[in-house]
Amino acid sequence: MGFFLFSPTRYLDGISGFFQWAFLLSLFLVLFKAVQFYLRRQWLLKTLQHFPCMPSHWLWGHHLKDKELQQILIWVEKFPSACLQCLSGSNIRVLLYDPDYVKVVLGRSDPKASGIYQFFAPWIGYGLLLLNGKKWFQHRRMLTPAFHYDILKPYVKIMADSVNIMLDKWEKLDGQDHPLEIFHCVSLMTLDTVMKCAFSYQGSVQLDENSKLYTKAVEDLNNLTFFRLRNAFYKYNIIYNMSSDGRLSHHACQIAHEHTDGVIKMRKSQLQNEEELQKARKKRHLDFLDILLFARMEDRNSLSDEDLRAEVDTFMFEGHDTTASGISWIFYALATHPEHQQRCREEVQSILGDGTSVTWDHLGQMPYTTMCIKEALRLYPPVISVSRELSSPVTFPDGRSIPKGITATISIYGLHHNPRFWPNPKVFDPSRFAPDSSHHSHAYLPFSGGSRNCIGKQFAMNELKVAVALTLLRFELLPDPTRIPVPIARLVLKSKNGIHLCLKKLR
């Protein structure tokens, strides 16, 4: 009869040996990645040596915290046309801010830069913003009718109703003596507008406290996704998911998805009513969500549930957050330039009177107000950059070239502040957009350009005009001298300390 003798010493030796091997393996992997990172970085710097690059940290790159926009302006003045921007790790991209360079890139069909946009996917999925190739073309063609002018015309009244709800709330505040942080109010208003116009929502999210959960989730995801792009270690899902930022991002995504799922479910329920279904079918042009739902009904293979939600998540974000940024910065620009604000107000009063009725035709009769809106979007573009991953080499007019596989980033912020094309670029000067003025076709791109320009740009411009016109009829906008906004780079242009304005009632 044999006996098995348990030996604690042998057991501990075994455990010790396992950890030794695990440590050696981990050390090898770390060294391997370090060598790989070093070689990749050196190759990129050599390959792109014709483009200037400011000194940067070997790991964190141009780690500028909230000073990235100020640094871009320095690069624009120091380096003609383009330069290198080192992000974290071996992530180096070519930053373009010359219209001739930008025109070349936007005239091609390169895909979105996967190394950047992949981090948007857990939030907004693969909708128009992230899709490439044939599927992007199919979705773009399917959704374009949602922005036909026959669809956009009746939206003007809906936009006006949403703006007036916001202004009614402002009327009840003592905004003259107590400055108001306007971005959150404007964000709820633009969400209200997109919900009613694109998603057939009944009611007002501005009067629903639960809607603030969604706008807060979008704000968090805006920051968290941007920070992830700037952290070399966060590109690995396993590390990011275990981090505090990763957990916060997961929670915010859940809130955002619950909101969009609720919107889809509500509209599906409405269309189960035969009367509502026939009413929708008789429309000459369907709205955004109905296009998706009818496409899903007619051919379940053409559009999956994941595709549908991705498009809803994408437009829900782009249709309210970018517009909220634009409106907030326009208000600030007008507040700090009272002479232009008053001229806009007089123009609006001559067209709208007391503002009880705003129509599509009215929006085309505001030339000076439109000039001011465009100039504010030049100074404060809601989307500060777009990136492409080159599918083939590209050569620019001056002979410099970028090889295949490199990320080319169009700095819209840098482009709009390029002194070679915009003299005194920091000065608010609406005359730049006077009818008799001209500028390079690719020097002004608040809605990007080329085949992948913003599908909802006319929708957005209409909303900007309605918001500015109705606000100027009811309030004089004054800056808060104690809290001057500091623009910072995020997925959408934000202010580090909010946008605070004093509101003086006019009636």
Curated annotation (Swiss-Prot):
One of its GO terms (cellular component) is endoplasmic reticulum membrane. Pfam families: p450. This is Cytochrome P450 4A14. Induction: By peroxisome proliferator methylclofenapate; 1000-fold in liver, 10-fold in kidney. GO terms for biological process: fatty acid metabolic process. A cytochrome P450 monooxygenase involved in the metabolism of fatty acids. Mechanistically, uses molecular oxygen inserting one oxygen atom into a substrate, and reducing the second into a water molecule, with two electrons provided by NADPH via cytochrome P450 reductase (CPR; NADPH-ferrihemoprotein reductase). Catalyzes the hydroxylation of saturated carbon hydrogen bonds of fatty acids. May act as a major omega- and ommega-1 hydroxylase for dodecanoic (lauric) acid in kidney. Catalyzes with low efficiency the epoxidation of 11,12-double bond of arachidonic acid. Residues 1-4 form a propeptide. Coiled coil: none annotated. The gene is Cyp4a14. It is a peripheral membrane protein. Keywords: Endoplasmic reticulum, Heme, Iron, Membrane, Metal-binding, Microsome, Monooxygenase, NADP, Oxidoreductase, Phosphoprotein. The modification Phosphoserine is found at S437. Belongs to the cytochrome P450 family. CDD domains: CYP4B-like. Gender- and strain-specific expression in kidney (at protein level). Predominantly expressed in females, the expression among strains decreasing in the following order: FVB/N > NMRI > Balb/c > 129 Sv/J > C57BL/6. Expressed at very low level in liver, kidney and spleen of both male and female C57BL/6 X CBA hybrid mice. The keyword Lyase does not apply. It comes from Mus musculus.
